């Protein structure tokens, strides 16, 4: 109980932790680069992803017995959780997708990359993005590049020209989050009050932010994360929506 570790974050006012529950739910476990997660269509990842979406707080719609690593909430506030899918340690996102999904096409890689960061940037908590992922960075499959040369760690700025759609999508996600306080609610009570999950099939996580959450100009917001290769149908509350 005296260690400053993730499990004890609730005792550390003003200090947060990276959410490996969410990271590994999205891309697969740290222990096996070739095993995928939600993005690869692996089953039973939804509850762990939902836990990350609420900022690792307690929430009545989350079954903690089905969360991958944590069996109880480990934050008092969503601001104590860092939401992310990759960082300087381990494989970067594009390398992990290639490693865990054999034969993945470039189109699939881009779509799943964007899906992952949509989850990160629409979740409660503090989003974190590895430098260069906004232009589909890779590190040639090197698992931990701290001792690798510049040929592995450098940023290939030509990727901005190769993948402008990726850069523009990331920019749009950041602008969306900055413009809408519903995605960055200040405390756990507000998250429990305004964020609810919708019924969804396997491979899909859907949630709504209701009643001008956080003073948002949008009354209701619906986010649907579909990792399946086929379209899906989700019943949403009656109303007029802009897609």
Q: What residues fall within each predicted segment?
A:
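Carbohydrate-interacting/catalytic domains
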Residues: 107-110, 119-135, 139-243
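Conserved alpha/beta catalytic core and glycan-binding cleft of carbohydrate-active enzymes
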Residues: 1-131, 135-136, 146, 210-216, ...
